[in-house]
Amino acid sequence: MTDTYDRPWLLLSLLRGLLSEVHPSLRQASVEADQEAKIVRVLFEYDGSPSPMALESDSCVAGQVLGDFPADWDVDERHVAVAYPNELSGLTHIGYRRLEPVDAA
């Protein structure tokens, strides 16, 4: 297992976790790693309040991402409502962003 968690590694971990777990209300999913604190952060931003099913699925995603790290790491997963067209914040590495009318222009 690697000791360096760079952009490609983090994005591949997040994207693998997102396979078949993306819900229509998910606007963006992002990830970053704090190597000093040994914490991987995963942020899910939804169009309005996420359904219980979306929360459960995305918690599974965060767990799968954490599974790619050594046992002494923790995950900080956040689920926030950011109704369209409000601006998304995101963490360092954006792994998923929903296509929205502003993006399609």
Functional labels for PLM-detected ranges:
Residues 15-18, 50-74:
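Short, non-transmembrane amphipathic alpha-helical segments
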Residues 22-41:
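Short edge beta-strands and adjacent turn/loop segments
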Residues 36-38, 49-51, 84:
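Generic "edge-of-domain/loop-turn" microfeature
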